[in-house]
C-alpha cells in the first residue's frame, strides 16, 4: 500500500511540472501569386509577395473595367483608341490567370546590374529569360496602391513605376510566359501613349507602357477616388499649362546628353529614368 501511494505521489509531481513548449511560427497569410527565389530574405519576400498580389489586383480591375464598359469607356478610348478590346483584355487576364511556373523573381543580383545607379531591377534576358531581379532600390522607393492619388501623385505627371503594381506589371510583360513577344515597348511616357492611341495604331493594345497607364488610371478613377481619379496636368487644371510649357527645353537637353551613354539593351522613360532588359 505504501509503495502504491509513493508511486502515485511521484506521478502527480511529474504531471505538475511545467512542460516546455516550442512556439511555432504562424503561417504567413501573404501568398505570392508568382514564385520568389530563396535569395530574397524574409522581409523582401513579404514585400515582394504583397506587391505581386497588388499587381494582380491592378490587372484584374483593368480587365473588369474593359469587360463592363468595352469601347464605351472614355478612359479606354483615351489609351487604346478604337482598337478592339479583346487584346487588352487578354493582356491583363494572363497576369491574373496565366501559369506562373515559368516565372521567377530573385534578389541576389547575379548579373551585377543592381550596382548601377538608379536600377530598381531588371529582366535577365539571355542570361535567364524566365527570371527578373528586384534590386534593393525598389524596396525603398515603390509605393502601395493604397496610397493612390495621395502625396501629390497624379497619373500624367508621375512615373508608372511609382507603385509596385505598375512597375511589376511592366516587368512581367518582359517575361516570355506573360508577354509572349506580343507586348513590347512602343511609346514612352504619358504623352507618348496618348499619341499612340490618337493614331489608332495597332501597337496601342500591345504597348506595355499603355497597359500600365490604363490600369493605373482606371484604378484611380474607379477605386481610389471614385468618379474623379487623379489624372493631373491640364486635364484637371488648365491654368497650370502655361507654367509647365517652359520646362521641356531643359529636359530635352538632358535627354540628349543621356542618350549618348545609354547601353543598347536600355531605353529611357519620361523623366529620364533608365530601364534596361
From Swiss-Prot:
Residues 233-263 have a biased composition (Acidic residues). The keyword Glycoprotein applies. Pfam families: HRXXH (PF13933). Residues 264-277 have a biased composition (Basic and acidic residues). Residues 230-277 are annotated as: Disordered. GO terms for cellular component: cell surface; extracellular region; fungal-type cell wall. Glycans are attached at residues 41, 71, 127, 200. SUPFAM superfamilies: Metalloproteases ('zincins'), catalytic domain (SSF55486). Residues 1-16 form the signal peptide. Keywords: Glycoprotein, Signal. One of its GO terms (molecular function) is integrin binding. Belongs to the ZPS1 family. This is Antigen 1. It comes from Emericella nidulans (strain FGSC A4 / ATCC 38163 / CBS 112.46 / NRRL 194 / M139). The gene is aspnd1.
